Amino acid sequence: MQLNPSEISELIKSRIQGLEASADVRNQGTVISVTDGIVRIHGLSDVMQGEMLEFPGNTFGLALNLERDSVGAVILGEYEHISEGDIVKTTGRILEVPVGPELVGRVVDALGNPIDGKGPVNAKLTDAIEKIAPGVIWRKSVSQPVQTGLKSIDSMVPIGRGQRELIIGDRQCGKTAVAIDTIINQKGKDLICIYVAIGQKASSIMNVVRKLEETGALEYTIVVAASASESAAMQYLAPYAGCTMGEYFRDRGQDALIIYDDLTKQAWAYRQISLLLRRPPGREAYPGDVFYLHSRLLERAARVSEEYVEKFTNGEVKGKSGSLTALPVIETQAGDVTAFVPTNVISITDGQIFLETDLFNAGIRPAINAGVSVSRVGGAAQTKVVKKLSGGIRTDLAQYRELAAFAQFASDLDEATRKQLERGRRVTELLKQPQYQPLQVWELAVSLFSANNGYLDDLDVKDVLPFEKGLREYLKTSHADLIKRIEDTKDLSKDDESALHAAIKDFKKSGAY
């Protein structure tokens, strides 16, 4: 077979014209050491702080230390297969996680990968894990409540949408229980919840997920889990991932609630990473920027204005403000709130709910110390009826705690002091509440109304909770219209007050408790 030179040249020309050569210009370097999930890389010149780096075996890392002749990175996931001399490439991207309604009802890891065995998430959008918080101009003051369903919190330490309220206390004193009850109480309230579990046992996280499923709360909840068995990098990133998922709803005019359980473990993970990266240690061996670690996270929780939402959605959503409410949890050691991380987070947040082991062990649960718990902005968001009725409760409790301390030393007490102590005992009993049984607004209002108007004063302390429960059942069956009015208006009119007085008197006469 004879080949025609002109045909060959034509063929070569057509091949050259049809060639699609894609130039992939990427910076690359070499691994010079791998220890404890920390990699040192030589030869990378153009790297951003927090940029994703690509390692062999489809593994990614995060650039954290940018030095003159090397880059310190932390590996996300397994690192056993990475060795000295491996090639590392830059990606030009900051770490992103999937966001959107597809995540609701799912359990994911810190990178947004599903870990609940229900198949892929199929989220249409991703967003950067680190974002700048909305500016002062775009924020609105807190004015709508987040009902926790817990008597002691809703009456004395109210939380508003867009607030940051710290839950602080020693281990095993009910911090997670308060957070889970708050999530359970959001059923039907149009509030998306995100629960971020950091450094907990996998079995504990599983128990929480199971409880949320049983109560039907998983339908509106995203669980982000970075268990104790996962790397320090994953525990460090989990809160930022959860926050980005929550911001998706905030920026589109919806309301979201995020719980970080707990930020002490995140600070420990960050300390571990920083020490391995040879950053200079400071107080309690934490790095110098541990305050910034938490402030940049918690400042992203905010109530944003209608203009912000309209601008963000390019006019698709109009006249709706969005909010992200944060409930960070901090674990103290032997009640020491003056340690480094607790003082940092107390100064960042808009108030704290302080849980005490002594109260917990005495059977007062939730174990909230009303004297030192405070909500700096939530009062503006409290429902009218609760605001009207709760003032007396806080005063009664504060006076009771003070008098109880003196009463230990005094043998004979005057009548007024004795009455105050008796009322305090009954109010303390009234504020006890079993786990997973959050209350509606009308139920809370009726309980506070009974205490304020002296209907509990002539009861034995042990009869207070049965009386409260019986009264609720009685009102449900005999005064459904009154309940509906209180629940709908979130207020107590003069007529409703009179009707409630009459109903409680009738119930007390019946003695059905």
From Swiss-Prot:
Keyword Aminoacyl-tRNA synthetase: no
Top-level EC class: translocase
Keyword annotations: ATP synthesis, ATP-binding, Cell inner membrane, Cell membrane, CF(1), Hydrogen ion transport, Ion transport, Membrane, Nucleotide-binding, Translocase, Transport
Primary location: membrane
Subcellular location: Cell inner membrane
EC number(s) per entry: 7.1.2.2
A GO cellular component annotation in the UniProt record: proton-transporting ATP synthase complex
GO molecular function: ADP binding; ATP binding; proton-transporting ATP synthase activity, rotational mechanism
Catalytic activity: ATP + H2O + 4 H(+)(in) = ADP + phosphate + 5 H(+)(out)
Family to which this protein belongs: Belongs to the ATPase alpha/beta chains family.
Name the UniProt record assigns to this protein: ATP synthase subunit alpha 1
Gene source species: Burkholderia thailandensis (strain ATCC 700388 / DSM 13276 / CCUG 48851 / CIP 106301 / E264)
